[in-house]
């Protein structure tokens, strides 16, 4: 006798399969969208242009952790600009709510909000980017971060619990690593910071090529672990 499935189980399986097939993974081209924001309607691809993008969601407007996060991102604009990065925030609140909250952010965080907040009231973007946990409140986006490169490829995702604010210094560190390793045959070791030694990718073995690519030389700790000064410094 076959297994009998009730409607709730079938619905769960269908939803799980749908979510799995629509998840955006590292290296994927992220989907485009048009959505309302505090800066008017935004066509994401057009707005992003040739920049890197930090797209980050927050659970709700007028909440304490999110207020500090959006203020921090505004203060970091000079650092984002140096790296050719645009920031854009998102929650499922409407534009009027966002605009009311902006005043609180600017007052309490002593800054000017200098980037758009997407008003994803219809959950269009949240669903595209899988920002709503299946077992959580459907009206609350998780605290996610997406780093997207100029080719519209997803390069990094972070997901934080609602109780924990994001570490934006770590976000800048990872962007530094991505931009460096896109242009040089290196990787960045644990706890690396801009200006510190990096490691040569193991696939490079030809001594002449190594000499050409790394004129400052390198230290071979193991054949697969070779340290060299950061090449763009």
Q: Language-model segments: what does each one mean?
A:
Residues 5, 12-233:
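Chalcogenol-based redox active-site neighborhoods
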């Amino acid at each position: 006798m076959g297994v009998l499935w009730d409607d709730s189980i079938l619905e769960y399986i269908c939803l799980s399969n749908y979510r799995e097939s629509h998840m955006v993974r590292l290296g994927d081209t992220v989907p485009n969208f048009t959505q309302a924001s505090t800066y008017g309607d935004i066509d994401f691809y057009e707005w992003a242009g040739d920049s890197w993008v930090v797209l980050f969601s927050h659970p709700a407007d007028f909440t304490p952790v999110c207020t500090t996060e959006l203020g921090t991102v505004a203060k970091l604009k000079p650092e984002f600009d140096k790296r050719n990065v645009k920031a854009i925030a998102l929650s499922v609140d409407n534009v009027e709510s966002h605009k009311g909250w902006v005043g609180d952010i600017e007052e309490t965080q002593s800054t000017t909000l200098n980037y758009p907040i997407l008003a994803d009231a219809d959950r269009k973007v949240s669903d595209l980017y899988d920002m709503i946990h299946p077992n959580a409140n459907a009206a609350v986006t998780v605290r996610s971060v997406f780093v997207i490169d100029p080719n519209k490829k997803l390069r990094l995702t972070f997901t934080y619990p609602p109780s924990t604010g994001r570490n934006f210094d770590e976000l800048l560190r990872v962007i530094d690593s991505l931009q460096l390793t896109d242009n040089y045959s290196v990787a960045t070791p644990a706890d690396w910071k801009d200006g510190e030694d990096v490691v040569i990718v193991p696939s490079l073995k030809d001594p002449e090529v190594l000499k050409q690519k790394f004129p400052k030389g390198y230290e071979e700790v193991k054949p697969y672990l070779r340290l060299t000064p950061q090449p763009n410094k």
